[in-house]
Structures are given as structure tokens and as C-alpha cells.
Amino acid sequence: LAGMLREKLGWDIEPQNIALTNGSQSAFFYLFNLFAGRRADGRVKKVLFPLAPEYIGYADAGLEEDLFVSARPNIELLPEGQFKYHVDFEHLHIGEETGMICVSRPTNPTGNVITDEELLKLDALANQHGIPLVIDNAYGVPFPGIIFSEARPLWNPNIVLCMSLSKLGLPGSRCGIIIANEKIITAITNMNGI
């Protein structure tokens, strides 16, 4: 997988940048509780969803109450009763309490696809605040590609990219894939081994 992503997408990625989990729900449980919740120093960190609505399945992935905060989107009205929602960067608040930013691409259940430009802006903001940008790519690019608008795959050491084999037609496999920097992969591997 690392070789394919390096060859096809030009990502600087090695096997040490990949962890497998018992499904993508397990992956998000690990990530949400690694970057959010009560810290050793007593501070509480939260998962920021820059768009709402977002996947309802995340609600059960935390060990604590009030783990999540979301932002109201800008809604673009399109012809024939259609709409698209976008990140409202003007009102997006990233503070000391933000432990990570998380977005699904495409968003479940609406199928909204965050644009490449929005994704790059979120990545820049996450970098600026020293927090990871987690992308739930269960339906997106580079695979399984169940996406109906233009979207360029994005990964760098500050991005945690999550994928799922079940969306490739292998639901019985219960295999989630996490692509991240080695420090995060080491933490996930340790959590996965318990």
C-alpha cells in the first residue's frame, strides 16, 4: 500500500506510516481519544467538525461526554432545489480546547465533498495550531472512489487519512486503514495491541 501511494500519488510514505485497525470505527475511537478528552494536566480537548451535519456514527466513539464541537456551514443554493455546504472559515473557531479537526470526504450521510481549496485551508489551520487534520476517507479518493465530484487526494505528515476496506466491497474484513506520521502510527499500534 505504501509503495502504491508513493508511486501513484507521490506521497513520502513508508510502511511505518500505515496502521490497520479492526474497522474504521475502531480507528476513530483510537484517534478521538488520543487527541481529545481529558489530558494528563486536566485540560479538556475537543474534536472540531468544521461542517455539520456530519456522520452520526462518531457520536459513540468517545470515552467522555461533550467530546465534539461542530461549526455551522455556509450553504450555497444551487439550481433545481440542490445545495452544497462549505466551511465557514470566517466564523470557524480553533482554540486551545481544539485537539484535532475532523472532516469526512465525502460527508456521510449527505455526500457533500469538501473542496480541495477548503481541505488545503483546513490543513494550513491545523498546522498553524499544532493539531492534526483527520480525514475520514471511507468513500473518497484514492480509493474506493465512491465520489461524484472532483477531489484530489491529500496527505502530509500533519494529516491523518483514514480508509475502510468495507467500502471496497469487503465488509466482512473489518479492516480500517490509518495513514499518518510515524509518531501517531506508533501510538495507534500500541492502542491496537491492547
Spans of features found by a protein language model:
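Conserved core of the PLP fold type I
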Residues: 1-129, 134-156, 160
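Active-site PLP attachment segment
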Residues: 150-188
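Glycine/threonine-rich helix-loop capping motifs at alpha-helix boundaries
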Residues: 193-194
